[in-house]
């Protein structure tokens, strides 16, 4: 579960500190990760803490889910790549385990909409965050009647889809009184964090430019006025999500620094606190990497024992097994770079656009600028980095 009340408490602390700097705050907007959500009752109160998408409850219901609606039909209707973590499958799993939710839940809010609600008291469903749920029709950009009816998900749980940029209301009086600050507007911005990141990219060229938003996940894609919902796109694991301006982000959700983060966490538990920059330095000292992994393999999805998983993957594919920490990190970083390259080439093939430039953004490129050397060698295109946050 996500401890949303703790997270919201930290948001209020951040607002209070920003106000204390003496700079008048005019507005606030929220973006978060996708697919997760919360249930509200008829009084507008949380029924329980929101599930985390890494919860394993969905797996046991996948077979039943896809008997009701095929992956092909779901992708054609919503443009969203079928995945166990998707909102639509999470909701289906919830209803199998807790059928009473259909009766007691009055509203479902995605995470940024939930935080906006806690800030302003206004219920909303912003487009970019809704677009990753598997519940929207890809063409109309409104809720898909066929998905709701086929899966027997109550449509009453969701309000009208709104485009980003709408002022919801001023910060609630309860919060202004609690924090002893002046009110300011709460705006429904680009609620999906990747949509927000892509909106901030200062593209340096008018030529077709791909983006890579680097973090725990890496989102590799291209902005387009039209979605791609062919069976070839489905087979390539591409997805279509919304942009702030109503266009589409044709992208692949790939593993990002998750494996690196888990290696760092495991080593810290073993008594070695190694920074990201130090990990990159260790990798740079490896002169000849001869092994690669598929960073999107299910073996790497769950936390824990990540070094052993990297070594096992190399062993199972008859490759040299990395021994030192630097070799392990080098295998992971170069494998990520080649996964990015494959995705860019798939997008080129399916859209008919030749991508000349790639713009990398996000916190994942901040660990060490030299990290992008791996991407630069693998991607064979002009590479631009920044901003990061």
Where are the predicted features?
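Active-site core segments that coordinate phosphate-bearing ligands/cofactors
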Residues: 66-79, 89-122, 135-141, 145, ...
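N-terminal glycine/serine-rich phosphate-binding loop of ATP-dependent small-molecule kinases
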Residues: 1-48, 60, 64, 76, ...
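Short beta-strand-loop/turn "lid" adjacent to the catalytic site in phosphate-handling enzymes
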Residues: 20-53, 78-87, 116-137, 160-163, ...
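Short glycine-rich phosphate-binding loop at a beta-alpha junction
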Residues: 24-32, 107-108, 160-161, 352-363
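Hinge/lid segment of periplasmic solute-binding proteins
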Residues: 56-70
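A conserved helix-loop-beta module that forms one wall/lid of the active-site cleft
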Residues: 145, 151-164
